[in-house]
Amino acid sequence: EVETVKRTFEIARLNLIQYHGDESPEFCDAVGLPYIKAFRVQKGMNLRSEIDRYPNASGFLLDAYVKGQPGGTGEGFDWELIPQSHAPIILAGGLTPDNARAAIDQVAPWALDVSGGIEIKPGRKDPDKMARFMDACRN
């Protein structure tokens, strides 16, 4: 499995891997390539402990936990659960043009990952919402 990841990395000429599953820190480190570890954040989760388990991560993507859904649900989570991190934070989950500025001000993430919050309907982006989102991020 480690060799499969390495080979895919080489073939696709990737710069970074983003792990969204139950990969252990040992597995991520054994691959030996730069990576972002994603966590689906839920109430009561000890996110500090989870982040600390991955000292070699290049960053962390934090999204809302929704049972039975891998992500992209449009659901948010309590940003107060986000601890300081040794690596950059990418914030996802329930982001919209109306809360993008608050997300930046409160969390100070390296990046925002938005999907459903700028859609007209599932899978269809709204150019106006996208422009409003970008304006909120810049101002």
Label the model's feature ranges:
Residues 1-16:
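Active-site beta->alpha loop and helix N-cap motifs at the rims of alpha/beta catalytic domains
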Residues 11, 22-139:
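Short loop-to-alpha-helix "cap/lid" segments that border enzyme active sites
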